[in-house]
């Protein structure tokens, strides 16, 4: 099968009327997908980093020793919300502290977003090619969801040490001399000495549960609604329509998976602790519900909705970056 020049230049073209790409052709586009995802991921995530840090602190403050305190530590007043976090952090630690943990986040996000996008397209092509014309089990929305989930799980396993480092550094509050970790290397080396490799990968099973839901809806939902709303006569949706659909899909995916994300962040906070608060993922669910109530699973969700604008931008402009790479012959 050959690909027309028009199809090559339009990565968002409706696939309903196209034959599936062969595996060699899919692999040929893998590197371009990787580059497009990396470009969008690092730039957008740096812009929304302060909101991301607010969200993480609100999620984890009930298991954050620096806030709740322990023997020898008095603790600090809890944050009431995103704006309370921003005002207090700027006043107590300076403006640049809003970006604390962003270095590890960008290091994580470049490969994570790049792998998510490229593998999502690769897995979807494999799933659709595995279905015959008479058997479309892995076509349409199901293939999109499964491809998004599989890509998310693969990428998470690869970058998980950076993911947990980002969470712990972002949740590490106070003046430089009072912080628990000095940076990525110090965090990883400290946790490895205390807990070994297990400590660096603490919370991975819980994280995979959330990624299956979030990435399946995030990638699969967006690809599906693009196909539904596209017209045969005009397969490419207008930019503003794609933005609206991306924002709706991103917000929905974030809310649906948010309790799972809260649990995984709480478990991440236990690496290096002598007396962990939670014995398992299930124990974490039970204790949060019993001691803090159902609302605690959604603490920081408003900040996450603001942050989702950045995630929506990645979905929308990913196609634009790919088109630019095609135009430039990269």
UniProtKB/Swiss-Prot annotation:
GO cellular component: mitochondrial inner membrane
Residue spans of the Solcar repeats: 28-126, 139-228, 241-324
UniProtKB keywords: Antiport, Membrane, Repeat, Transmembrane, Transmembrane helix, Transport
Subcellular location: Membrane
Residues annotated as transmembrane: 27-61, 103-127, 137-171, 203-230, 236-270, 300-325
InterPro entries according to UniProt: ADT_euk_type, Mit_carrier, Mitochondrial_sb/sol_carrier, Mt_carrier_dom_sf
Catalytic activity: ADP(in) + ATP(out) = ADP(out) + ATP(in)
Segments of skewed composition (Acidic residues): 1-10
Principal cellular location given in the protein's record: membrane
Segments carrying motif Substrate recognition: 264-269
GO biological process terms on file: anther development; mitochondrial ADP transmembrane transport; mitochondrial ATP transmembrane transport
Binding site for ADP: 108, 120, 264
Membrane-related topology note: Multi-pass membrane protein
Disordered as annotated region, ranges: 1-22
Pfam families in UniProt: Mito_carr
GO MF, one example: ATP:ADP antiporter activity
Quaternary structure (record): Monomer.
Similarity section: Belongs to the mitochondrial carrier (TC 2.A.29) family.
Other noteworthy facts: The transmembrane helices are not perpendicular to the plane of the membrane, but cross the membrane at an angle. At least 2 of the odd-numbered transmembrane helices exhibit a sharp kink, due to the presence of a conserved proline residue.
Role this protein plays: ADP:ATP antiporter that catalyzes the exchange of ADP and ATP across the membrane.
Record-given protein name: Probable ADP,ATP carrier protein At5g56450
Organism of this sequence: Arabidopsis thaliana
